[in-house]
């Protein structure tokens, strides 16, 4: 009986670490894809309207920072899940 309880707790701890690692990986992949799409769209917009390059670049940096902030929060939540 005690062995079964110990094995279940060990398995639960291992799955928690796996889940935290997968969550962090998905957050980073999502942020990379999002920032890549933002950069690509901004370059297309600058190619179409070179005179608006300053405004487009400013908006691109702000949106990329927001996407990166969401990814950072997701990684922090995964780390908290891992260690707490």
Curated annotation (Swiss-Prot):
Transmembrane segments: 21-38, 60-80
Places the protein is found: Cell inner membrane
Keywords associated with the record: ATP synthesis, Cell inner membrane, Cell membrane, CF(0), Hydrogen ion transport, Ion transport, Lipid-binding, Membrane, Transmembrane, Transmembrane helix, Transport
Primary location group: membrane
Cleavable signal peptide: none
Bilayer topology: Multi-pass membrane protein
A molecular-function term among this protein's GO annotations: lipid binding
A single GO cellular-component term on record: plasma membrane
InterPro entries: ATP_synth_csu_bac/chlpt, ATP_synth_F0_csu, ATP_synth_F0_csu_DDCD_BS, ATP_synth_F0_csu_sf, ATPase_proteolipid_c-like_dom, F/V-ATP_Csub_sf
Site feature Reversibly protonated during proton transport, where: 68
CDD domains: ATP-synt_Fo_c
Family per record: Belongs to the ATPase C chain family.
Assembly: F-type ATPases have 2 components, F(1) - the catalytic core - and F(0) - the membrane proton channel. F(1) has five subunits: alpha(3), beta(3), gamma(1), delta(1), epsilon(1). F(0) has three main subunits: a(1), b(2) and c(10-14). The alpha and beta chains form an alternating ring which encloses part of the gamma chain. F(1) is attached to F(0) by a central stalk formed by the gamma and epsilon chains, while a peripheral stalk is formed by the delta and b chains.
Function noted in UniProt: F(1)F(0) ATP synthase produces ATP from ADP in the presence of a proton or sodium gradient. F-type ATPases consist of two structural domains, F(1) containing the extramembraneous catalytic core and F(0) containing the membrane proton channel, linked together by a central stalk and a peripheral stalk. During catalysis, ATP synthesis in the catalytic domain of F(1) is coupled via a rotary mechanism of the central stalk subunits to proton translocation.
Protein known as: ATP synthase subunit c
Organism field: Phocaeicola vulgatus (strain ATCC 8482 / DSM 1447 / JCM 5826 / CCUG 4940 / NBRC 14291 / NCTC 11154) (Bacteroides vulgatus)
Name of encoding gene: atpE
